[in-house]
Amino acid sequence: MNPMEEVRIFKVTLNIGVGEGGEKLARAERLLEEMSGQKPVRTHSKVTNPEFGIRKKQPIACKVTLRGERAEKVLKMFLEGIGNRLKASQFDEYGNVSMGIDEHIDIPGMKYDPEIGIFGMNLSVTFEKPGHRINRRRIQRRKVPQKHRVSREEAIEFMKEKFQVKIV
């Protein structure tokens, strides 16, 4: 296979949507830091929603972006927690995959801590092929051609080969 056509993981993003700030959000941040080894960043609400008691620009969630070996390690742990099974509908047209878990204690290696509690979380994996830097660089920025973008089928094949995931 052409080395420029090999699919690779660009980033893994872990997200916990708490829905409120304060102590609960701080506990979610501690959990993400414990899982990933990186300090999470807070995300803020975009609009005011009085039904949920949320004001605009209020911190309501936290996320952490992982790259490299750390991303693969966390992805393997997460996949074991959901039983190494994914639905084909979890892959989008650009080959990205998103999954969620209801309780973080289902992930191997994670223990229940009464100070933190139990949180559910979402994980998104972004795939790319070598050469995608042309889309991000500052000088002579270009679009990635359609034939060089990662397709749904390529991402599914990558997950089957590298992580032995079953597609249901």
UniProtKB/Swiss-Prot annotation:
One of its GO terms (molecular function) is rRNA binding. One of its GO terms (cellular component) is ribonucleoprotein complex. SUPFAM superfamilies: RL5-like. Pfam families: Ribosomal_L5 (PF00281), Ribosomal_L5_C (PF00673). It comes from the Archaea. Keywords: Ribonucleoprotein, Ribosomal protein, RNA-binding, rRNA-binding, tRNA-binding. GO terms for biological process: translation. InterPro entries: Ribosomal_uL5 (IPR002132), Ribosomal_uL5_arc (IPR022804), Ribosomal_uL5_C (IPR031309), Ribosomal_uL5_CS (IPR020929), Ribosomal_uL5_dom_sf (IPR022803), Ribosomal_uL5_N (IPR031310). Signal peptide: none annotated. Belongs to the universal ribosomal protein uL5 family. This is one of the proteins that bind and probably mediate the attachment of the 5S RNA into the large ribosomal subunit, where it forms part of the central protuberance. In the 70S ribosome it contacts protein S13 of the 30S subunit (bridge B1b), connecting the 2 subunits; this bridge is implicated in subunit movement. May contact the P site tRNA; the 5S rRNA and some of its associated proteins might help stabilize positioning of ribosome-bound tRNAs. Part of the 50S ribosomal subunit; contacts the 5S rRNA and probably tRNA. Forms a bridge to the 30S subunit in the 70S ribosome. This is Large ribosomal subunit protein uL5. It comes from Methanothermobacter thermautotrophicus (strain ATCC 29096 / DSM 1053 / JCM 10044 / NBRC 100330 / Delta H) (Methanobacterium thermoautotrophicum). The gene is rpl5.
